[in-house]
Design a protein with these regions (language model features):
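Conserved long hydrophobic alpha-helices within structured protein cores
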Residues: 82-91, 185-196, 215
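Flexible coil segments in periplasmic/lumen-exposed cytochrome c-class electron-transfer proteins
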Residues: 22-30, 34, 38, 45, ...
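Disulfide-stabilized extracellular ectodomain repeats and their linkers
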Residues: 45-48, 61, 88, 147, ...
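Sequence contexts marking disulfide-bonded cysteines in secreted/extracellular proteins
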Residues: 19, 49-52, 154
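Bacterial N-terminal signal peptides that target proteins for export
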Residues: 1-9
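C-terminal motif of bacterial Sec signal peptides marking the signal peptidase cleavage site
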Residues: 15-17
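Gly/Gly-Pro-rich "capping" loops immediately C-terminal to redox-active cysteine motifs
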Residues: 30-31, 37, 41, 53, ...
């Protein structure tokens, strides 16, 4: 056996040993470019869970893990909101084309997985759902619909009911931070994480019609102040 052959074998042995050097990152530890992240747990956990909750609920923003919401909102609606955000609210744009960090494919993957994991078509089978979006209705008719469907929890004027842990839904700062579509979504889908029923109401209640939903939203939107925060306290 020649010395050259022995040296070659030794070099190959050293190279093979490099594959298991101490400190070498495992496959799961290797850096992945942000635009190549595909796992739902990573995409949702890094971009959505801070507002919408680790499991799509119990976060400061509305739950996405909500069968009624996912039944009303189409894939196109979810992709548009995720991509472009909601101007004037705390929902940012995530699409790279809109200044965010996610590719169109990553956003489509997020929406597909959210629906696969959290949608429950059987929960709304046979239910006539109001459309996701619609023009504002009539505020005066909305006052009557609000009185019959909402006032028992939120108060006759929307400022809440003494002894009930529900804040004002006519607070100027709140209305300044929520869009008309945000109000509509809440009226339709409720807030299951906060104990608020959807448009069907509680047991024995009469569901709101599509027209009544639009009217209630108009009633609330009409209370949005032009300049949130006023009147300002007098300076001494």
């Amino acid at each position: 056996m020649s010395a050259r052959f022995v040296h070659a074998l030794a070099a190959l042995a050293l190279l093979a040993g490099c594959a298991s050097l101490p400190g070498k990152p495992t496959h799961d530890e290797r850096y992945v470019r942000p635009d190549r992240v595909t796992a739902f747990a990573d995409l949702y956990g890094q971009n959505c869970s801070g507002c919408h909750g680790a499991d799509g609920r119990l976060g400061p923003a509305r739950p996405i893990n909500d069968p009624v919401y996912l039944a009303v909102a189409s894939d196109a609606d979810l992709i548009r909101v995720t991509s472009q955000g909601v101007p004037g609210t705390t929902m940012p744009a995530f699409a790279i084309s809109a200044g965010g960090t996610l590719t169109d494919q990553q956003i489509a993957d997020l929406v597909r997985e959210m629906r696969a994991r959290w949608a429950k078509p059987q929960d709304v089978a046979g239910v006539t759902l109001p459309p996701y979006a619609a023009p504002l209705g009539d505020a005066q008719r909305g006052a009557a619909a609000y009185a019959s469907a909402c006032a028992s929890c939120h108060g006759a004027d929307g400022a809440g009911v003494a002894g009930k842990a529900r804040g004002s839904i006519v607070d100027g700062s709140y209305l300044a931070l929520v869009s008309d579509q945000g109000l509509r979504t809440t009226v339709i889908a409720g807030r299951s994480d906060l104990g608020m029923p959807d448009f069907r109401g509680g047991a024995g209640a009469t569901p709101l019609s599509a027209a009544q939903v639009a009217d209630v939203v108009a009633f609330l939107a009409a209370k949005r102040p032009e300049f949130p925060g006023r009147p300002y306290p007098e300076s001494k």
